[in-house]
């Protein structure tokens, strides 16, 4: 199996006595240690207008991480394309790919939080159309060495050559967040890699991987399990009381996230909004417990086809260390053959 990390940093607000940058600097050190522990990648979120300091300038922070590391893959999970000028985003992403020596994993999505679209004064109804148009522009920008133009519904560019070029050819790997069947089929149709969220229970993860594999193979391609990354929250070595407290914290975070994401009419059909706000649901999508308990859950994930797991360390850096040292070694072999 392969393991990366997933997450965010927080910048606290306050007066002159508050070090607002401490959380970001700690996150960079978290990534430096993750590389030393053998983690393969770091995927970082993009969110806006939360009120609790989530990462908004994802590529900026990843550039800093890239400068402090040498092998860690630098992933976005995800850049929400409807909010960005696609040519400018292509330039920024190419720059970090060059500076890092070709380590960018470009994760993209169309967004699901209503408050973010409202903050940017963009109708959520335009999300899919903007996403598809921007994605096409970005790929065109990365693969064209001569001037080109684009006249679309949302964007127009005339005679542009996007600089700099990317280090990876024809462009950095593209990962796409998806959960619903139609979205998963779209990922396969594009030939992209699949990012799966951190809340789905194991059986649902298996169904999504099976669908993606079927779609990939149905197009005459060989399925590579490393083209699917599954995110899981991890907290190692807890008492029963600590586990319940951690799960309650997880449920509260989900509720806070859903309040930000919900449309005024209550109609948000994103798959990430479909999970129950219960302790049972929280535990079903997490790897919480002793190393042995976590290993058992991880084996269940592997049994349904997951070979690449991104861990969001709810237990902090010590959990990251213990997971790497006490859980990962048992899963470092080759994947089992599946029919």
Q: What role is predicted for each listed range?
A:
Residues 2-22, 83-149, 193-195, 200-206, ...:
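Flexible, glycine-rich active-site loops centered on histidine and acidic residues
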Residues 9-24, 79-87, 168-178, 234-237, ...:
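Active-site mouth loops of central-metabolism enzymes
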Residues 35-36, 62-71, 93, 97-104, ...:
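Acidic (Asp/Glu)-rich catalytic clusters
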Residues 5-7, 125-162, 203-306, 332-339:
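An alpha-helical appendage that flanks or caps ligand/catalytic pockets
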Residues 1-74, 172:
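N-terminal beta1-alpha1-beta2 module of alpha/beta enzyme domains
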Residues 38, 46, 65, 96, ...:
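Conserved, mostly hydrophobic/aromatic
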Residues 3-7, 42-44, 74-76, 104-108, ...:
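Hydrophobic faces of well-ordered beta-strands that scaffold small-molecule active sites
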Residues 52-76, 130-134, 324-338:
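Alpha-helix-loop-beta-strand connector modules within alpha/beta enzyme cores
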């Amino acid at each position: 199996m392969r393991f990366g990390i997933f997450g965010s940093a927080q910048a606290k607000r306050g007066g002159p006595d508050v070090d607002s940058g401490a959380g970001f600097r700690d996150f960079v050190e978290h990534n430096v240690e993750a590389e030393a522990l053998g983690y393969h990648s770091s995927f970082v979120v993009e969110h806006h207008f939360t009120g609790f300091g989530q990462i908004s300038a994802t590529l900026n922070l990843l550039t800093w991480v890239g400068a402090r590391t040498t092998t860690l893959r630098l992933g976005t999970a995800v850049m929400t394309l409807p909010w960005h000028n696609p040519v400018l985003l292509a330039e920024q992403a190419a720059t970090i790919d060059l500076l890092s020596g070709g380590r960018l994993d470009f994760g993209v999505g169309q967004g699901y939080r209503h408050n973010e679209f409202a903050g940017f004064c963009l109708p959520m109804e335009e999300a899919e159309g903007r996403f598809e148009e921007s994605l096409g522009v970005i790929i065109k920008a990365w693969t064209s060495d001569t001037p080109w133009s684009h006249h679309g519904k949302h964007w127009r560019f005339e005679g542009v050559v996007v600089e700099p070029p990317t280090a990876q050819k024809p462009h950095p790997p593209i990962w796409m967040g998806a959960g619903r069947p139609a979205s998963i089929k779209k990922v396969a149709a594009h030939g992209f890699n699949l990012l799966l969220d951190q809340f789905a229970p194991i059986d649902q993860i298996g169904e999504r991987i099976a669908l993606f594999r079927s779609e990939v193979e149905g197009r005459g391609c060989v399925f590579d399990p490393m083209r699917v990354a599954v995110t899981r929250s991890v907290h190692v070595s807890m008492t029963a009381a600590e586990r319940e407290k951690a799960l309650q914290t997880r449920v509260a975070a989900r509720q806070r996230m859903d309040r930000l994401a919900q449309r005024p009419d209550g109609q948000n059909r994103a798959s990430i909004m479909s999970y129950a706000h219960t302790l049972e649901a929280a535990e079903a999508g997490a790897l919480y417990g002793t190393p042995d308990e976590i290993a058992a859950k991880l084996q269940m994930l592997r049994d349904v086809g997951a070979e690449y797991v991104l861990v969001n360390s709810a237990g902090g850096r010590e959990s990251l260390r213990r997971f790497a040292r006490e859980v990962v070694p048992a899963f470092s072999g080759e994947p089992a053959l599946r029919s």
